[in-house]
Each structure stands twice: as structure tokens, then as C-alpha cells.
């Protein structure tokens, strides 16, 4: 039963999780239970509410699909890549992240538990924990790309959720799971981070280049702490 915004988000997520399994590594039916609190023979709703659809993209999809996403990606001016907890990164992994950073207007937000150190990385934890809610407005991205496990930054998630109307959220997950910490997840890329960053770096438009504006916005504020 949807009584408010949180209920709506939760139901949207559950329905997306269920329907996305219809053709996920095989096909088959799904069953969705809907509570009915009273009997009624009347259904007079002419227009159903608009809901969010979460797409799943995998390496076995046509390459044209990935190029379409690369074209969209090149048009974003403020891309926040959030690295959650990870075990380790190989040299090849870091090289792919750096190639991506050079091609797109982004920064890579890391924490100690991210275990990622390479070009484009910023330790954003001090800034997110010290900033007031209103200060995040200028730093708010128009695209979030997240990967890894839990994000330790206590205040970052609430700040992101408070500005969820301003951005799109892509998640990288090797199992294709829906993990919607922003309340705004739109696309799940079922692949490794290395595949994702390498693929988009290679499919970037020829003239695509990080102008460093968004990176410098975060870096300058961090230096002021």
C-alpha cells in the first residue's frame, strides 16, 4: 500500500526487480503479490501514474546500444563516479578508470575502503561530512555512476537523495542487481567495472575530453577544509 514517497520508491524498486528477471539469464514467469484491502467492482482510474523503469544493460547486447550510452555520457557536464568498498584493483583496472576520466567530465569519489588510487580520484569523505545540505547544490552531479559495495560516507547519501530530481543514476554490478541508494537509479550495467570503464573510454566520441571543471570544483572545496 503506497502511503507516501518512501512507499512509492520501495514499490517501484520491487516491481523493477521482479520484471527485470523475466529475461535475466533465461526466461520465465514472475509473480507479484498486491495487497487488496477491500473488494470493489469499480475501477474508474483513467490515467495510471508514471513510474520509473530501471534498465539492465549487459555485454551481450548489440554494440550499438553501448555506443548510444557513450553518446549520452559525453553530453553530461558533471559526472560523479562513486567507488564504494572494494577488495583491490589491478593495474589494468586502474588504467581503465584513468582512460575513462580523461574522456569524460567526471571525478572519482573514493574513501579509504574503496582501495582505489589513480588519476581522477578525490577523497571526498571529509567534504561530504563537513558540508551543509544546501552547499551540495553547486556540487550536485547530473549523472552518478556507482560501483563497489557499501558507501561509508554518512551524509553523502542523504545529500544525494535531497537532490535526486537533478541527476540520473547508473549502477555497475557484476550480477546485475538493483541497488538504489539514490532513489533515482535508472540503469544497471551487468559487467565488471573494468569492462564498463574500458568500453566507454573506447566508445567515447573522438573529440570527447574531460575539461576538468567539475573535478576542480570538488578539489577546490576539499582544499579549503
Model-derived features: where do they sit?
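Phosphate/pyrophosphate-binding active-site segments
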Residues: 162-225
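Conformationally flexible catalytic loops at phosphate/diphosphate-handling active centers
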Residues: 17, 21-75
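Active-site donor-nucleotide binding/catalytic segment of nucleotide-sugar enzymes
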Residues: 77-89, 215-219
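Glycine-rich beta-alpha junction loops
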Residues: 34-40, 85-87, 113-114, 176
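Conserved acidic residues
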Residues: 77-79, 142, 186
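Glycine-rich, anion-gripping cofactor-binding loops and their flanking helix/strand elements
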Residues: 83-170
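Conserved thiamine diphosphate
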Residues: 1-27, 202
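Short acidic-hydrophobic, aromatic-tinged amphipathic segments that line or gate anion-handling sites
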Residues: 1-2, 123-132, 186-200
Amino acid at each position: 500500500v503506497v502511503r507516501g514517497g518512501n512507499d512509492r520508491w520501495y514499490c517501484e524498486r520491487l516491481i523493477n526487480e521482479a520484471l527485470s528477471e523475466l529475461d535475466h539469464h533465461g526466461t520465465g514467469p514472475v509473480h507479484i503479490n498486491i495487497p487488496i484491502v477491500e473488494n470493489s467492482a469499480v475501477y474508474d482510474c483513467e490515467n495510471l501514474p508514471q513510474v520509473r523503469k530501471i534498465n539492465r544493460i549487459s555485454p551481450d547486447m548489440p554494440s550499438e546500444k553501448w555506443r548510444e550510452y557513450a553518446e549520452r555520457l559525453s553530453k553530461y557536464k558533471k559526472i560523479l563516479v562513486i567507488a564504494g568498498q572494494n577488495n583491490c584493483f589491478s593495474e589494468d583496472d586502474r588504467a581503465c578508470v584513468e582512460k575513462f576520466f580523461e574522456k569524460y567530465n567526471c571525478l572519482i569519489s573514493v574513501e579509504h575502503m574503496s582501495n582505489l588510487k589513480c588519476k581522477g580520484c578525490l577523497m571526498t569523505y571529509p567534504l561530504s561530512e563537513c558540508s551543509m545540505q544546501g552547499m551540495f547544490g553547486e556540487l550536485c552531479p547530473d549523472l552518478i555512476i556507482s560501483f563497489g559495495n557499501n558507501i561509508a560516507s554518512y551524509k553523502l547519501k542523504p545529500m544525494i537523495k535531497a537532490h535526486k530530481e537533478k541527476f540520473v543514476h547508473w549502477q555497475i554490478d557484476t550480477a546485475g542487481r538493483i541497488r538504489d541508494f539514490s532513489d533515482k537509479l535508472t540503469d544497471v550495467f551487468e559487467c565488471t567495472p573494468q569492462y564498463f570503464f574500458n568500453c566507454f573510454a573506447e566508445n567515447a566520441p573522438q573529440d570527447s575530453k574531460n575539461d576538468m571543471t567539475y573535478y576542480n570544483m570538488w578539489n577546490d572545496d576539499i582544499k579549503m577544509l
